[in-house]
Amino acid sequence: MEKKRIYLFCSAGMSTSLLVSKMKAQAEKYDVPVLIDAYPETLAGEKGQDADLVLLGPQIAYMLPEIQQQLPGKPVEVIDTLLYGKVD
């Protein structure tokens, strides 16, 4: 089975890096076939083309319409602020 690509985009990176690590650990634990990576928001239009799912950190939620426009047909969602803050 081909792995799905989940790409997270944010402005700072530290919290997102922690979240990516936890997501990768859970995917491995439950044998979920995904590749998860994080990038700065400046690469959303470029890197997002290769993603199956694009997640945005809450600090760049204001960019949702712009990124959706750059990635027509791609699912783009903002990570819930509470879950993001808990790195859960």
From Swiss-Prot:
Q: Where is the active site?
A: 10
Instruction: Provide any one GO MF term from the record.
Output: protein-N(PI)-phosphohistidine-sugar phosphotransferase activity
Subcellular location as annotated? Cytoplasm
Q: Which UniProt keywords apply?
A: Cytoplasm, Kinase, Phosphoprotein, Phosphotransferase system, Sugar transport, Transferase, Transport
The Gene Ontology biological process terms listed for this entry are: phosphoenolpyruvate-dependent sugar phosphotransferase system
Q: What Gene3D superfamilies does the database record attribute to this sequence?
A: 3.40.50.2300
Pfam families linked to this entry: PTS_IIB (PF02302)
A GO CC annotation recorded here is:
cytoplasm
List of residues that carry Phosphocysteine = 10
Its domain of life?
Bacteria
Chain segments annotated as coiled-coil in the UniProt record: none
Domain PTS EIIB type-3 positions = 3-88
Catalytic activities: D-cellobiose(out) + N(pros)-phospho-L-histidyl-[protein] = 6-phospho-beta-D-glucosyl-(1->4)-D-glucose(in) + L-histidyl-[protein]
Q: What does the UniProt function comment say about this protein? A: The phosphoenolpyruvate-dependent sugar phosphotransferase system (sugar PTS), a major carbohydrate active transport system, catalyzes the phosphorylation of incoming sugar substrates concomitantly with their translocation across the cell membrane. The enzyme II CelABD PTS system is involved in cellobiose transport.
Q: What is this protein called?
A: PTS system cellobiose-specific EIIB component
